[in-house]
Amino acid sequence: MDKSESTSAGRNHRRRPRRGSRSAPSSADANFRVLSQQLSRLNKTLAAGRPTINHPTFVGSERCRPGYTFTSITLKPPKIDRESYYGKRLLLPDSVTEYDKKLVSRIQIRVNPLPKFDSTVWVTVRKVPASSDLSVAAISAMFADGASPVLVYQYAASGVQANNKLLFDLSAMRADIGDMRKYAVLVYSKDDALETDELVLHVDIEHQRIPTSGVLPV
């Protein structure tokens, strides 16, 4: 067995093979990735000179409601076993929670996988009782009751799945910033073990503007 075969065998031993196999990258794929990176850098450069509340990745590029801005938090689930769960309450920065009576209109989850991701996950946001410890049994029951929409995110060979966002409208509930600690992001790894940091979840919380928001997000 040569060195490359030995390395491959060691890698397969450490991790159970996925349900499907990826096709070998083509030159067209490589060119597409390079072009995407160039466009991304160009967009960042242009955006830096145009402060605006029309955030390019928020609510599908919708404009924030008049008098509102948003706060983003990033969640990186730890390793999740096959057919198991992860839950994390929404904890905003102290500079935001200081204004706990400011209304929250919407919560959006954006799913961004790392390159090694090739699985299926279910993602949702739920209002969770303070007494809940977000155990596997508790999260499983919340996914099963059908009381909230669920984003099914699947591996896409061409890159990020087109539908990678889930939007929750809380305006009718008169929820405020102080209520956000009662909500949690829940993840179900359906088909495979999800490795540490294999998935990144960006949670955008649109809320009434607060005095500390002196600079518009871009």
Curated annotation (Swiss-Prot):
Alphabetical keyword list: Acetylation, Capsid protein, Ribonucleoprotein, RNA-binding, T=3 icosahedral capsid protein, Viral nucleoprotein, Virion
Biased composition (Basic residues): 11-21
Residue numbers spanned by region Disordered: 1-29
SUPFAM superfamilies tied to this protein: Positive stranded ssRNA viruses
GO molecular function list: RNA binding; structural molecule activity
Name by which UniProt lists this protein: Capsid protein
GO cellular component annotations of the record: ribonucleoprotein complex; T=3 icosahedral viral capsid; viral nucleocapsid
